[in-house]
């Protein structure tokens, strides 16, 4: 299933490339690729910037690596390529934040090992604005689309609690215990890529390009 998903992602880019290539006088000046910070491995100590040389790793890392390799081929068509490595997108209208708010109705939630995993996130409004910023300023190359101030998963839970106006009681589950069911059903990569995601990703490059965040920290989200 994983290989099928990866192939579908890459094949869609190949199809788009061939369509544009057939148009000798195409007027496509820029392609903005929605990539992911999943290209970076989990780490308790490193801060990742765009210069990091990713190696073959877990499923999500491999998908993103192949995706970014394929998108660079559009340069051959004299098209400016902008790759945005998107972090965890936060919005009260959908995604993980909305799910956490819904879960908070139970007033009980589980975190892994105290919820200290680093979460490199971005508010959906900033993400939309960064796409616009990339077009207006003709950005080229790879940029991390993340907030300048990453948070822990526990802080994300606390934000959901604040937005739902309900106090939340967190229970910490040891990683060694939670990993067992994922290992038994053969989706260990999903556990490391999503459930136990822990990566500190730098926003310095997009900030230095002139972008000003509306939501530089979780405290701004209300």
Residue ranges and their predicted role:
Residues 1-4:
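Short, small-residue-biased leader/transition segments that mark boundaries at the very start
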Residues 6-10, 46-68, 90, 117-121, ...:
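Short-chain dehydrogenase/reductase
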Residues 13-57:
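Conserved Rossmann-fold NAD(P)-dependent oxidoreductase catalytic core, especially the SDR/UDP-sugar
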Residues 58-61, 65, 72-83, 87-118, ...:
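NAD(P)-dependent short-chain dehydrogenase/reductase
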Residues 101-109, 116-150, 158:
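Alpha-helical substrate-binding/gating segment
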Residues 136, 169, 190-222:
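C-terminal amphipathic/interface module of NAD(P)-dependent oxidoreductases
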Residues 137-187:
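Mid/C-terminal beta-alpha module of Rossmann-like enzyme folds, strongest
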